[in-house]
Every structure is written in structure tokens, then in C-alpha cells.
Amino acid sequence: MADDREKSTDQMKLWKEGRGSQRPDVLTTGAGVPIGDKLNAMTAGPRGPLLVQDVVFTDEMAHFDRERIPERVVHAKGAGAFGYFEVTHDITRYSKAKVFEHVGKTTPIVVRFSTVAGEAGSPDTVRDPRGFAVKFYTDEGNWDLTGNNTPTFFIRDTLLSPSFIHSQKRNPQTHLKDPDMVWDFWSLRPESLHQVSFLFSDRGIPDGYRHMNGYGSHTFKLVNAQGQPVYCKFHYKTNQGIKNIPVEEADRLAATDPDYSIRDLYNAIANGNFPSWTFYIQVMTFEQAENWKWNPFDLTKVWSHKEFPLIPVGRFVLNRNPVNYFAEVEQLAFDPSNMPPGIEPSPDKMLQGRLFSYPDTHRHRLGANYLQLPVNCPYRTRVANYQRDGPMCMHDNQGGAPNYYPNSFSAPDVQPRFLESKCKVSPDVARYNSADDDNVTQVRTFFTQVLNEAERERLCQNMAGHLKGAQLFIQKRMVQNLMAVHSDYGNRVQALLDKHNAEGKKNTVHVYSRGGASAVAAASKM
């Protein structure tokens, strides 16, 4: 029945109804010149060639030829929505950030959800981490929290980032997804065990974007009005309840409704079923960080909720769909270096790398003036600096104000109260190898204590079902890493691989051994 159609399916109909009795606008060129005919090109005679003076055609085609912008290297497929963040608990003892300044304060936000490895046209229901990035339009500039639906990540050293992403993408010759690439990297870098185990658990395929938690993942630093700092992690827990999709259903949806998650989010908001999340922090003092048994800045590990309990802060609600996807989602750009006073980076190596990488890729993808785009603009504060010109400068370029600093003409000046907090660092500069920094203990806890028996069985089945596509020597190396976590983990996956491999003999390959991290070596250090 037509009356049963989803709001997303009826978007065009609803747009027309929203105009009421308004007459159609006059069709124009990009320069605003009215157009008399949009169906027929201007030619010399009914069968003749086109005329160069047909500016209706050239204006249309020239713009069409330039519609596409570079696709995001990662997080290419996504959905977005707007809403607000509301403070429900006072945390001013930890942070002076105005976004937290009093209970009841609300701040506009925009959120982008995404898959990670797939291209813009890939299915929503693949086994993949989900991006969960939040932009807060605060009184003191934008705060971008670039999170995921997982509290950990695959690597802890940012220098590995390009190679890790390459391993998850397509083979450079065949242009196919390659299990050898994926598992070769993971098995050579056993710090990935924690995230890989989470990925192949039930939570590896969340039911849309509304039924999953989010995490800032990185370690950050909060500073209060007295200049006292603490380290923190950010968590946002779904108020819709955790729901995941079984493998068979995910495969079916990938074929029949590849945009399942985008559709689900859009329709929920359009129907007034606004999704929300409760926002928490974990706090660790500098003294606790010095004495903690693990590196508190290691992105492959979590902070124990028993030692560092969740502290409620607020909630955020998504209550508006984008008016235009390209303008408000495709051009949406998150930068973890956007931190208002009271929120600062920690020594987290992955965060440090992303402070450069994220804005750098936005300048490539959107241009030097991407922060002038309405969705990225810090519209709740006044931007005043000495940056000028560049492609697509869309405002007054700061008029006649001086474009150099310092100057004697009352142009923007610094305010010492906004100086970053002091911090101590090691004087010993080197390339520190952290490959064997206990890659197994927290994974063992996840396998034996977080998961129940049915979940452990599904984890092993999911992992073996993907690992079977890799070469035998890669399978063997990965199982050795799992054995270092727990013998039951390794034995289960090996038994399933033996069954898969018996069904089709693998090609034998000869390889040269390479130096790499070893989960077994890490276990032996415990």
C-alpha cells in the first residue's frame, strides 16, 4: 500500500507537500540567469551540430563533470544526523570546557556514522568497525570527537596507519579484497588481537547505527579552571539497547538492502523516534597513569571500569535529518585537533598522528577553506586569525584587517588564559618498539569473562570463516597468536580451519621469514 511507504521512500513527495501552494521557482543557470528550454540543446538546424554559445548546455555539463570530490580513504560510506548535547551531571572539577559548564546546558551537534574499509557504495551490514564521530558546535570553537563503536583499535603506533589501511583495502593488482593481505598484517602485528576479537564477535555487525555504543577510544586530557589536569576516555552508550545482526541476515541485507543502516537512521528520525546516547567519562590521575600496569595511552587496551568507573556527564539526541546529503554529510569533516580550552591531547601515539592526518586529508578532499563550509564552520564563535585567500574563500576574507602578526593596528591578539597546560615528556628521543607490550592479557579477559559460551563459539566460527581464505602459513601464525591468548581460543579456531581446509586443499607457498612482533613472545614476558 502507498500509505505504508517509509519516510525515506517518500522524500520527494514530502518535499513537494512541504512547499504547499508555492509555485515552482524559475529555473536558472548557476549564475541565476533564467532558462527558457531545458530539454533541447541549441543546434544549427534540427540535425545540425551543437553551438558553443549554448551556455545552458555548457553550464550544466561543466558542473556535472565536476560533481564528484575525492572519496574518503576510510569511512567512505556513512550517514549523518543533527541534534544536541545536554549536560546532566557536573564535571567542572575535571574540565573548564564551556560545553560542560553547567547542568542543563545544551550544545548543537552533528554526528556521522560510517563503516570503515568499504567504498561509498559498499553494503552497510559488512563485518567492520563503525565510525561514530561527533562535532560539538561549542561557544569556544568546534570540538570534534572522532570515535568508533569499539573502545580499542588494531594498532598502537601511528606509523603503521597507512600500511594497516592498505591491508584492509583492495589488492593493488587484482583490485579484489584479499584475505592474505588482511590476515598477514594482523598476524604479524598481534597488538591487533583485541580489536580483531571484538570485530569477529557478535558486535562486529551492529543492527544499524542506533543500537551500538560509541567510544572516543583515545586517551585525552581534561584541564579544570585551576589548571589541574587528568587523563580521560569518552564513552557514549546507546539508549536504544545493543542489537546485532546474525551473519546470515547480514549477508541477506547486503544483497537486498545495502543501505540498511542509512535507511534505518533516516526513517527513525523522520518518524520522531529520536535516537539518544548517554555520555560518560573515565578519569585517571597523572599519578595513576605513572603507576598503572599498562601504558594508559595504548589504543589497543581498555581502562578497567572497576578501577576507573564510568562518570555520567550528559546525553546527546539526534532529532534532524540532513537537508542535503552532499552539503551536510559528504562535506562534513572531523578533526581531532579541534579541542576547545579544557580538552587537550594526551601522548597517545595514534591520537598524535591523527591530529595531523585528519585535517590534512580534509584539505586534500575539500580544499584549504573547508572550515568555511556551513557544516564545518564554528558558527557559535567568531573566527579571527591571519589566514587569508586560498581556493573557494567564501566569506569576506576578514576584510581590511591586517594579515600579519604581531601588528600595531588592533587586530586579533592572543589571550594567555587560553594557553595549553604544561606537561612533562621524556628527554630520550628514539623510535620505541612497543610491538610486544602484552598483547594478550586483556584479550584473554575478553574471551573468558566478557563473552559467554555461545558468544565464544560464534566468535571462533566467524573468525575461522574469514581466516580460511588466507594461506596456510598465515593461518598457522594467527592460530599461534590465539593460542598465546588462551589454548581454547586457538584450538577452536584451528579445529574449524582443519574442517575448512579438508574441503579444499590449499596451495603450498614458500615464504621468507620476517622479523615481527610475536604474541607468544609477549605471553612469555608475563
Swiss-Prot record:
Catalytic residues identified in the record: 75, 148
SUPFAM superfamilies given in the database record: Heme-dependent catalase-like
A GO-annotated cellular component: peroxisomal matrix
Region (Disordered): 1-29
Documented EC number(s): 1.11.1.6
Keyword Transcription annotated: no
Residues where NADP(+) binds: 194, 201, 203, 213, 237, 303, 305-306
Subcellular location: Peroxisome matrix
Assigned keywords, A-Z: Heme, Hydrogen peroxide, Iron, Metal-binding, NADP, Oxidoreductase, Peroxidase, Peroxisome
Catalytic activity: 2 H2O2 = O2 + 2 H2O
Transmembrane regions: none
Enzyme's top EC category: oxidoreductase
Main location: other
Cofactor(s) this protein requires: heme; NADP(+)
GO molecular function annotation: catalase activity; heme binding; metal ion binding
GO terms under biological process: hydrogen peroxide catabolic process; response to copper ion; response to hydrogen peroxide
InterPro entries (UniProt xref): Catalase, Catalase_3, Catalase_AS, Catalase_clade1/3, Catalase_core, Catalase_haem_BS, Catalase_immune_responsive, Catalase_sf
Alphabetical list of Pfam families matching this protein: Catalase (PF00199), Catalase-rel (PF06628)
Biased composition (Basic and acidic residues): 1-22
PANTHER family: CATALASE
Family membership noted in the UniProt record: Belongs to the catalase family.
Role summary: Catalyzes the degradation of hydrogen peroxide (H(2)O(2)) generated by peroxisomal oxidases to water and oxygen, thereby protecting cells from the toxic effects of hydrogen peroxide.
Quaternary assembly: Homotetramer.
Protein's name according to its UniProt entry: Catalase
Organism: Danio rerio
